[in-house]
């Protein structure tokens, strides 16, 4: 199977969603201006971030903050597939303030771990991704995103 990328952007929120598959070298070190929340669907996704080498397997969630330099490769011949959401900081701040009545002045999250083994978070991430990527009804997308942010 060769490399492929399926990119979409939500017209209402600006959230970008990417589902991709890579074999071998995936991408060189780079960073994003947005928060990334994604889940590995298939294979082993190996990447370096925050000076640590990570190996994400199906069901694991990866969490990157704006400016986190990371790379990517598939250490096994079947490659890896992942789904990820790119959340703009301004949008995320607005949503967290709407969800949590007593949110502090700067309510943007800080991820203690880049790779997470939380089944509930993985399910919420996958559901939010699918509703945004498949452009479900606005109320369905908003509910799924609220559930993800509440994790």
Predicted regions and their residues:
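Amphipathic alpha-helical segments enriched in hydrophobic/aromatic residues interleaved with Lys/Arg
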Residues: 100-151
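N-terminal regulatory/effector-sensing and dimerization cores
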Residues: 4-105, 134-137
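An acidic intrinsically disordered interaction segment
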Residues: 1-9, 112-117
